[in-house]
């Protein structure tokens, strides 16, 4: 049982900086300004469902994609590390706010024409929460745990859905409490937390690249 808790804790530590629910909260508040309470709650719930579904598909279909295109685990680690480090760098030194991204601007224009437009999938679930970095990390981690032998087989089967469900529930709770979070933390607090998470992501990405290079050296030495 301790192995299960360890796997869940490790998964949340890896995924939450990438998912970064607080950034999604700021984006949600910017896009849902004209929605009533019931519609906001519906969008929050649907965004969480979409995030869970995207993560599940990435985890279980990722290996199939790798095998189909002949992608090696070291190659995936290096590519995933580059993406994660790049996303972390952008969080550490942001060029634009979350609500200024192309996806958010496009959705804002759509909301101006149709106030009840769906914002749950784009941009809240993807790319804000379950974006390219999150998907790359999930696929890479799936390959690592399946071939690493660090956890028992039953933990590898049970832990991922629990981790993805926990991330989705955390996102749902943050979106439902978005107003209170913004009043408590403020925009400055969210930016500070995002920069800290960005630094962690840069470190994780660099470590992924190092592990990939070392595995290539070990394989072809």
Swiss-Prot record:
Signal sequence residues: none
Cytoplasmic side: 29-45, 90-118, 176-196
Residues in the Periplasmic compartment per record: 1-7, 67-68, 140-154, 218-221
Subcellular location(s) of the protein: Cell inner membrane
Keyword Cell membrane: yes
Membrane topology: Multi-pass membrane protein
Keywords, comma-separated and alphabetical: Cell inner membrane, Cell membrane, Membrane, Transmembrane, Transmembrane helix
Membrane-spanning parts: 8-28, 46-66, 69-89, 119-139, 155-175, 197-217
Cellular component, GO annotation: plasma membrane
InterPro entries linked to this entry: Multi_antbiot-R_MarC
Recorded family membership: Belongs to the UPF0056 (MarC) family.
Name of protein: UPF0056 inner membrane protein MarC
């Amino acid at each position: 049982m301790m192995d299960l808790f360890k796997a869940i804790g490790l998964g949340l530590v890896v995924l939450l900086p990438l998912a970064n629910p607080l950034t999604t909260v700021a984006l949600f508040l910017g896009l849902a300004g004209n929605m009533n309470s019931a519609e906001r709650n519906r969008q929050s719930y649907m965004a969480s469902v979409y995030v869970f579904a995207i993560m599940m598909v990435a985890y279980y279909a990722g290996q199939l994609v790798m095998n189909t295109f002949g992608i090696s685990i070291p190659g995936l680690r290096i590519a995933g590390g580059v993406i994660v480090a790049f996303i972390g760098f952008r969080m550490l030194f942001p060029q634009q706010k979350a609500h200024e991204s192309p996806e958010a601007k496009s959705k804002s224009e759509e909301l101006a024409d149709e106030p009840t437009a769906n914002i749950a999938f784009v941009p809240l679930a993807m790319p804000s929460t379950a974006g390219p970095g999150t998907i790359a990390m999930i696929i890479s981690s799936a390959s690592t745990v399946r071939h690493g032998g660090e956890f028992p087989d039953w933990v590898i089967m049970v832990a991922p859905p629990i981790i993805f469900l926990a991330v989705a529930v955390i996102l749902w709770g943050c979106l439902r409490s978005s107003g209170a979070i913004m009043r408590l933390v403020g925009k400055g607090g969210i930016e500070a937390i995002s920069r800290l998470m960005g630094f962690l992501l840069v470190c994780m990405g660099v470590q992924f690249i190092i592990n990939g290079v070392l595995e290539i050296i070990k394989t072809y030495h």
